[in-house]
């Protein structure tokens, strides 16, 4: 469950007319904080970002799932169901056993995913994949 401050910041960004990706960024930032604080870990920076985006979609941020061919079909379906859950407002009570096992698995993972160097590496790689709008993609 996202914290109240994260929800407040995301709503404020929405009021200011910011893009859904900007609003979702708050949830990703919170996820990185959780990893840094040691609440849990993540296998990779990509996984940490994915968790944040999923939470954003479930919280009702209008961030559509990625298009066909961008990511694996499993990821797309997961994003689709998270998006649908956030938009309909109907939430089933999460299974305690499933939540516990997920958290337990994440606790076993490392904390390197949220370091400055890991985030910088991820940002550079993402910029390189973009065809336009970045110096990194040109270099």
Region annotations inferred by a language model:
Residues 1-139:
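A charge-rich, low-complexity, intrinsically flexible signal that marks solvent-exposed coils, linkers
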């Amino acid at each position: 469950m996202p914290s109240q401050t994260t929800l407040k910041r995301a709503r404020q960004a929405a009021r200011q007319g910011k893009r859904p990706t900007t609003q979702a960024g708050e949830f990703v930032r919170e996820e990185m904080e959780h990893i840094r604080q040691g609440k849990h870990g993540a296998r990779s920076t990509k996984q940490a970002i994915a968790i944040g985006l999923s939470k954003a979609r479930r919280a009702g941020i209008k961030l559509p799932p990625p298009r066909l061919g961008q990511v694996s079909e499993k990821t797309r379906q997961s994003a689709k169901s998270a998006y649908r859950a956030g938009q309909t407002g109907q939430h089933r009570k999460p299974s305690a056993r499933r939540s516990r096992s997920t958290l337990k698995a994440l606790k076993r993972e490392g904390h390197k995913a949220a370091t400055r160097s890991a985030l910088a590496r991820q940002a550079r790689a993402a910029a390189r994949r973009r065809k336009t709008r970045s110096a990194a993609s040109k270099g």
